[in-house]
């Protein structure tokens, strides 16, 4: 999961930040305003066509609250949630046709709760469960028609 956070930070640096205020991302992944103060507020980045690319909430330079990613078409791609820079809450991903393809839950930076994966047609393919980053409960796998094909119990 650290890799996802680093990827997001790298992505924002490479993409060239464009927002309502000049925001700079330092080598630690903290966001600063043009006066080099830790930034609090909403950060928005846009595609060259003017559509939003990403919108996130920051508190004292750290991602805190909702993060929304968009496809270049302007359609929503993913909603994430952070608490003090750590993954926390429900993350939902949609494909370009607007079909929900994933729902995941985190708590204090770790996988926690129910996870669901759907195919591009909206058919449930996987149901998984985590507690504090560990696999728990009954995991299920479904075929392309939605028929249960496998179950694995994790203690």
Question: Residues of each region from the PLM?
Answer:
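Bacterial Sec-dependent N-terminal signal peptides
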Residues: 1-24
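Glycine/tyrosine- and acidic-biased, solvent-exposed loop/turn segments at the edges of beta-strands
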Residues: 17-155
